[in-house]
From Swiss-Prot:
Organism per entry: Picosynechococcus sp. (strain ATCC 27264 / PCC 7002 / PR-6)
Identification of the protein by name: Photosystem I P700 chlorophyll a apoprotein A1
Entry binding sites for phylloquinone: 681
Purpose: PsaA and PsaB bind P700, the primary electron donor of photosystem I (PSI), as well as the electron acceptors A0, A1 and FX. PSI is a plastocyanin/cytochrome c6-ferredoxin oxidoreductase, converting photonic excitation into a charge separation, which transfers an electron from the donor P700 chlorophyll pair to the spectroscopically characterized acceptors A0, A1, FX, FA and FB in turn. Oxidized P700 is reduced on the lumenal side of the thylakoid membrane by plastocyanin or cytochrome c6.
NCBIfam families from the UniProt entry: psaA (TIGR01335)
EC number(s) given by UniProt: 1.97.1.12
Signal peptide segment: none
Taxonomic lineage of the native organism: Bacteria, Bacillati, Cyanobacteriota, Cyanophyceae, Oscillatoriophycideae
Binding site for [4Fe-4S] cluster: 562, 571
GO CC term, one of those recorded: plasma membrane-derived thylakoid membrane
Lipid bilayer topology: Multi-pass membrane protein
InterPro entries to which the protein is assigned, alphabetical: PSI_PsaA, PSI_PsaA/B, PSI_PsaA/B_CS, PSI_PsaA/B_sf
Length: 739
């Protein structure tokens, strides 16, 4: 299929670049009131509101993607530059179990020098928990010069992306049919991006990472390791991996087993580094590459063979599903909001899956014994996943309001879900009530029994047991199965299911995670909070066009404060408001998830190996006995573990002590926006303006109180920011102290 582009569709205008709000007639006139700056930010990237031409909207989104990639490359470049210029990476490489990673040095302008703690090896700096040192070692970086070069490469890529964004909007812009060619896009993304991308990474792992890491593991100093290009010599590689002496002969004679010295299937963790075997990782990426290159030949493009997505979707109907998926292909090729909603839901869920793999199958050398990094990466991926999933709810509702055409969706699955929305939402609501009362009820019972001195009547591992038998069964199966399915493997996929304790330098990297009554109870709190988040987002989506309360909701748009005067009790019903409320429950859910993870790991996994071979855990296994009451969570988790952040003043961790307070302050500040009405502020502003007029200081731009929606947006933003900063400080001060 020929690539279709329009040449020079939009002239490059520096005049427009210099004019804020050029995309909107009202905004382009400049500010009359302070509302202008808020509307400018709200609408700058709302391409739907700037034009109704789907082709132009598609081009703007496409161009913005390149802008986004440019920002990512600049950000990554900065990370690598810090690693090259301000870090102890080379010292850490040679003594990774003793020296701590640092890639930031504070200038002592007003005495911040105290923050540069001693991280070992004669280096003073801020200890980082991004895990980049571990990633760099796995990739085969052996000196800071290589990091410099990569940082420069990142800037070159950023410049290229900025150019591409400009070029594909102003010089050669793709036609709409190019954006709508789903089959070609899928083939390209599967084969080229995922397939060839994985194959390229496999090549790097085999030719650079494996030899470098094998030498580092065996104790060779980083400065004595050959440079990457020296490994192109097969005789040098053959010293480490004998099959290299045979070249490509085993490949073409189908004697692939010969390559099993660097493409392995060991399972478990490398006992030197506490990470997945790098040769397993290379093998995995090779397999992924083969799978995706084949998958990228599935769809029918210019050759008349393969699948058509439209045909697959329309053929997919069961006996009870009416028209099935008919009409969904058109939705996904004409509504980018619908497409984005599906992708965000999937990517968000996948990101939370990644959070769990980072600790259960740690991919990078020495990462598993850096408890601060493990906690940071779990928290980071969990929260990012949560934001993406709420974004799915947001764009799903925007699709319903702006792009959904009921006439084109008669009796298909989407129409049937919308027509069943009362049954769906009322049942989901019942599930939420059931989960909430029962899960919380178990804690209320336990607190009451403990308060009354009746431990024998509590739900606990030593009284009335509520063992998670299904989870224990899954753990058991995963521990035993490899013995039958992969008899040559050394260990199972992950030690969290069962197996031996893996320790690096007398520090636990990973060990079996035993589950009991405490886990069963908090698991059902997770189930409750996640279901409530889904309830809010799904209700917002299903009722975004109409409801019994506001039948013409679709006409009011995605975000509106209330259904006008004389309609009391119609506030917070817009699609936007459901996203606003969903964010609080997302934060609520994930706070309990990361608290559960943090305490469980400190209690049952992280710790040191004593001379007699037993494990001394950080909090001595108190999770099973303390996490079964609300009082236990407050006393033995929040209060006991916040001692490090509260007592951090005067130490290298003191910034976290200040951030802990600042985060609480920002959180409290958010309540000022969430608990007060617009009228209060407008009244206050008018009295302040009167005072200015009295002094002949009248402002040229008229002050206006934030709109109701803007106030809620500022409120939820500061609520989340305050909560995230507080948690960040609490977790980091704690984990860096125990780490």
């Amino acid at each position: 299929m020929a690539v279709k582009v329009d040449k020079d569709p939009v002239p490059t205008s520096f005049e427009k670049w210099g004019k804020p709000g050029h995309f909107d007639r009202t905004l382009a006139r400049g500010p009359k009131t302070t509302t202008w700056i808020w509307n400018l930010h709200a609408d700058a990237h709302d391409f739907d509101s700037q034009t109704s031409d789907l082709e132009d909207i598609s081009r703007k989104i496409f161009s913005a993607h390149f802008g986004h990639l440019a920002v990512v490359f600049v950000w990554l470049s900065g990370m690598y530059f810090h690693g090259a210029k301000f870090s102890n990476y080379e010292a850490w490489l040679n003594n990774p179990t003793v020296i701590k990673p640092s890639a930031q040095v504070v200038w002592p302008v007003v005495g911040q020098g105290i923050l540069n703690g001693d991280v070992g090896g004669g280096f003073s700096g801020i200890q980082i928990t991004s895990g980049l040192f571990y990633l760099w070692r796995a990739a085969g970086f052996t000196n800071s010069y290589q990091l410099y070069v990569t940082a420069i490469g990142g800037l070159v890529m950023a410049a290229l992306m900025v150019f591409a964004g400009w070029f594909h909007y102003h010089k050669a812009a793709p036609k709409l049919e190019w954006f709508q060619n789903a089959e070609a896009m899928m083939n390209h993304h599967l084969s080229v991006l995922l397939g060839c991308g994985s194959l390229g990474w496999t090549g790097h792992l085999i030719h650079v990472s494996l030899p470098v890491n094998k030498l580092l593991d065996s104790g060779v100093a980083a400065k004595d390791i050959p440079l990457p290009h020296e490994f192109f010599d097969a005789s040098v590689m053959a010293e480490l991996y004998p099959s290299f002496a045979q070249g490509l002969k085993p490949f073409f004679t189908l004697d692939w087993a010969a390559y099993s010295d660097f493409l392995t299937f060991k399972g478990g963790l490398n006992p030197t580094t506490g990470s997945l075997w790098l040769s397993d990782v290379a093998h995995h990426h090779l397999a992924i590459a083969v799978l995706f290159i084949i998958a990228g030949h599935m769809y029918r493009t210019g050759f008349g063979i393969g699948h058509s997505m439209k045909e697959i979707l329309e053929a997919h109907k069961g006996p009870f599903t009416g028209e099935g998926h008919k009409g969904l292909y058109e939705i996904l090729t004409t509504s980018w909001h619908a497409q984005l909603a599906v992708n965000l839901a999937l990517l968000g869920s996948l990101t939370i899956v990644i959070a769990h793999h980072m600790y259960s199958m740690p991919p990078y050398p020495y990462m598993a014994t850096d408890y601060g990094t493990q906690l940071s990466l779990f928290t980071h991926h969990t929260w990012i996943g949560g934001f993406l999933i709420v974004g799915a709810g947001a764009h799903g509702a925007i699709f319903m309001v702006r792009d959904y055409d009921p006439a084109k969706n008669v009796n298909n699955l989407l129409d049937r879900v919308i027509r069943h929305r009362d049954a769906i939402i009322s049942h989901l609501n019942w599930v939420c009530i059931f989960l909430g009362f029962h899960s919380f009820g178990l804690y209320i019972h336990n607190d009451t029994m403990r308060a009354l001195g009746r431990p024998q009547d509590m739900f606990s591992d030593s009284a009335i047991q509520l063992q998670p038998i299904f989870a224990q069964w899954i753990q058991n199966i995963h521990t035993l199965a490899p013995g039958g399915t992969a008899p040559n493997a050394i260990a199972s996929a992950s030690q969290v299911f069962g197996g031996d304790v893996v320790a690096i330098g007398n520090k636990v990297a990973l060990m079996p995670i035993t589950l009991g009554t405490a886990d069963f109870m908090v698991h059902h709190i997770h189930a409750f909070t996640i279901h409530v988040t889904v309830l809010i987002l799904l209700k917002g989506l299903l009722y975004s066009r109409s409801s019994r309360l506001v039948p013409d909701k679709g006409q009011l748009g995605f975000r509106f404060p209330c259904d006008g005067p004389g309609r009391g009790g119609t506030c917070q019903v817009s699609g936007w408001d459901h996203v606003f409320l969903g964010l609080f429950w997302m934060y609520n859910s994930l706070s309990i998830v990361i608290f559960h993870f943090s305490w469980k790991m400190q209690s049952d996994v992280w710790g040191t190996i004593l001379p007699d071979g037993s494990v001394s855990h950080v909090t001595g296994g108190n999770f099973a006995t303390s996490a079964i009451t609300i009082n236990g969570w407050l006393r033995d988790f929040l209060w006991a573990q916040s001692s490090q952040v509260i007592n951090s003043y005067g130490s290298a961790l003191s910034a976290y002590g200040i951030m802990f307070l600042a985060g609480h302050f920002v959180f409290a500040f958010s309540l000022m926006f969430l608990f007060s009405g617009r009228g209060y502020w407008q009244e206050l502003i008018e009295s302040i303006v009167w005072a200015h007029n009295k002094l002949k200081l009248a402002p040229a731009i008229q002050p206006r109180a934030l709109s109701i929606v803007q106030g809620r947006a500022v409120g939820v933003a500061h609520y989340l920011l305050g909560g995230i900063v507080t948690t960040w400080a609490f977790f980091l001060a704690r984990s860096l102290s125990i780490g």
